[in-house]
């Protein structure tokens, strides 16, 4: 599967979903440069692997072993997990490297929360305006009540670039991690908590 990397938003947005266009509007309004890949829905490992290869993604182990001068060309493609406590009174969006193992008990201990589980599709739509497979840090732009707490695994911050969906799983974006932390997250008005998983 061959994918083409494009700079910025699509030239023609008439066929794009409104939630995706809002992401491009936000990124453009705050001066964030980003690369974009359009692809089949990222529901299979074949599609995810093709996106990862196009963006130059390495495994976490390869990334940590890489000479720091060579890291700049690689992006950490995140899996974004939408979590909640048992009572569904607290919601969390966790950004973690795609190949990093996630254990809920490790995270629960760090954020002083009771047992965590995955939030349902209805909560994804209500708080982030996304569907399963499309969860993204960029969905926080739709959390106007600031209900969702952003959690970022410290390994995400080690790469010069980070990859995520623009609230739809038929496109993927790559942007500088510095822009994510210094421009995007402040614009989303969701103060992150850094965790070590």
Feature-to-residue mapping (PLM):
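Extended, low-hydrophobicity, polar/charged segments
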Residues: 1-197
């Amino acid at each position: 599967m061959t994918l083409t990397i494009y700079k910025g938003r699509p030239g023609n947005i008439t066929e794009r979903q409104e939630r995706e266009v809002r992401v491009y509007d936000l990124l453009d309004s705050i001066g964030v440069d980003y690369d974009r890949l359009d692809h089949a829905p990222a529901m299979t490992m074949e599609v995810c692997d093709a996106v990862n290869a196009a963006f130059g993604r390495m495994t976490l182990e390869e990334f940590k072993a890489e000479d720091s001068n060579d890291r700049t060309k690689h992006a950490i493609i995140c899996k974004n997990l939408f979590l909640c406590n048992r009572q569904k009174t607290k919601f969390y969006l966790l950004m973690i490297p795609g190949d990093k193992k996630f254990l809920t008990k490790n995270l629960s201990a760090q954020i002083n929360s009771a047992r965590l589980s995955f939030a349902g599709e209805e909560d994804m739509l209500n708080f982030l305006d996304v569907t399963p497979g499309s969860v993204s840090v960029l969905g926080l732009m739709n959390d106007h009540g600031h209900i969702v707490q952003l959690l970022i695994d410290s390994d995400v911050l080690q790469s010069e670039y980070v990859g995520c969906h623009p609230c739809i799983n038929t496109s993927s974006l790559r942007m500088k991690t510095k822009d994510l932390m210094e421009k995007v997250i402040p614009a989303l008005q969701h103060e992150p908590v850094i965790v070590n998983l």
